[in-house]
């Protein structure tokens, strides 16, 4: 008896499309024949996962499955005479999902290369002529705000799968291959299942050759016939100004090497912005907090302020109020698109000392009694001025 498709993917019946796709990718990677050679249980799980995804990823099929169970799905996926039915074209969704996993969603690479794209009714997928496409490699690159502001070039050492030097990436001592004895060169395995509505054909990658159609002769002892091994390479990454945290750069062909001569995957560099001890980022602008004493705010002054380009002299106007924002043009972060840079804003606040000397305390008391700086007196004068103006208007 067939398992429930939702149980196969480990989902509830209210699962969203994204949840279905995510679960499928995880399980397909887990049970893929390349990772589980000669493992019949894994092969069976792989087939079940493919079948469940093929049904639940299609809105119409999912509706029929929810209403009628497996019989509802089989009616659209089968036809008489062993030919492909309407559901066969939906296998392109499966290979498209594999494309996302192995080739970053590109037209080339992944299972599209292995099978040559989705076949039409009664069609056949071609096998890859140059091995399986290598997987993408993702790394994180930490950058300072100064590096992000101006752009930077980094030289990185990364560990990845590289072509075996002993066999030149072929997987064979002599470089010779032979037709796969399991799939006889087709690169795929077909299993037919009869239902009350007709015959359903399930097509999967050949577990022996991984969909290539050929297997190596005289396996290389260094790479065990895979044509790849773990190595370390040096890569230069040019990061433009203005990138943000979690932005990424894609270096085509710099990822893991493909088994047995397959094309390289891509290297995906994810930007990670380091927190700055002085500046706070706001888009392409930066904010710096400056604390000044009360006399400097009242009388005005000139102070040295740090920027992403070094120190600059900033003029503080007399009677500057706390929380005032002063602008330093062109000292922010370079624009990712277009020329120019953002600005730096200096937020001015008053510095209040935790301790004062007895002499300073007396000076502050004397200053407190001055009507020029008393907030209460100032408020009274403003209110009086308002009423005086009102009286003048209506008199």
UniProtKB/Swiss-Prot annotation:
Keyword Thylakoid found: no
What cofactor requirement does the entry state? Zn(2+)
Q: Where are the zinc fingers (CR-type)?
A: 151-232
Q: Where is the J domain?
A: 4-69
The residues listed in the UniProt record as binding Zn(2+) 1, with positions renumbered to this chain, are: 164, 167, 220, 223
Which compartments is it annotated to reside in? Cytoplasm
| HAMAP family associated with the record | DnaJ (MF_01152)
Name the record gives this protein: Chaperone protein DnaJ
Species: Chlorobium phaeobacteroides (strain DSM 266 / SMG 266 / 2430)
- From the UniProt record, report the name of the gene that encodes this protein: dnaJ
